[in-house]
Regions:
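Catalytic-site neighborhood detector that most strongly recognizes the C-terminal catalytic loop/helix
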Residues: 98-102, 183, 187-208
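Short basic/aromatic active-site micro-motif
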Residues: 60, 134-137, 153-173
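Conserved tyrosine-mediated DNA breakage-rejoining catalytic core shared by Y-recombinases
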Residues: 25-26, 31, 37, 43, ...
Length: 233
């Protein structure tokens, strides 16, 4: 069934089938438990800085990075048009309806990952040329070459960009329910499957606990106070 869904997605991406006719919108394929691959901040940096001379490979890399910073699926990226980009109070937002779920998603591009998606978008003369990717299998082949070029020993597919986005948002401390809305998940349980705890996140959280404990010890004779556990912001 997964293979059939892949073929249907490809037919939509190539224009042989209308997105409104997507047959799997209400059909859920059983999710197998397993580790979802994602890129660490260091691996993402390698892809950001790698020198790529081939124009088609550069295009694939930019599209992949754009989705690392927005969480778009391949099918949603390929459907983008100028109408999806709206200005709200002078800031660019991305509005679109997910091909897979039909959920409407609104992304404040200026607030996500220091506007990096906008920086990539502005390199291209129009969104039509940017969104015109080769078929998914060809894109994945290019991504494997890029991973090898960067010394990344992971099996990279286009969907890794979406999982990377979710993982890094959680790593930055964004609430899981907010990540759910940004990704367009109908259930927070789906978002929790996508989130991973990075080692650096564990270290950061434990250091925060240590700092709070030190604040408490500064008042040994006064007992514990509620304010000792609240950050002044």
């Amino acid at each position: 069934m997964r293979q059939l869904r892949t073929l249907v997605n490809e037919a939509i991406n190539q224009g042989y089938m209308h997105a409104d006719a997507y047959p799997f919108r209400k059909y859920k394929i059983k999710q197998e438990k397993g580790r979802h691959e994602f890129l660490t901040p260091d691996e993402l940096k390698k892809l950001e800085t790698v020198e790529v001379e081939e124009e088609s490979m550069r295009h694939v890399l930019d599209a992949f990075l754009f989705c690392c910073y927005t969480g778009l699926r391949y099918s949603d990226f390929c459907q983008l048009s100028p109408a999806n980009f709206i200005k709200v109070n002078g800031k660019r937002w991305l509005y679109f309806k997910s091909v897979k779920t039909g959920v409407e998603i609104r992304l404040p591009l200026h607030l996500l990952f220091e506007s990096r998606a906008l920086g990539i978008l502005d390199r291209y003369p129009d969104i039509g040329s940017f969104a015109a990717l080769p078929c998914n299998s060809e894109v994945n082949k290019q991504l494997r070459k890029l991973a090898e070029l960067c010394g990344i020993k992971k099996r990279i597919t286009y969907h890794v960009s979406r999982h990377t986005c979710a993982t890094l948002l959680v790593h930055q401390g964004v609430a899981i329910t907010t990540v759910q809305k940004l990704l367009g998940h109908t259930s927070v349980k789906t978002t929790q499957i996508y989130s991973e705890v990075l080692s650096s996140t564990i270290v950061r959280d434990l250091k925060n606990v240590q700092r709070k404990r030190k604040k408490v010890k500064m008042f040994p004779d006064k007992g514990l106070r509620t304010s000792d556990f609240i950050d002044n912001r």
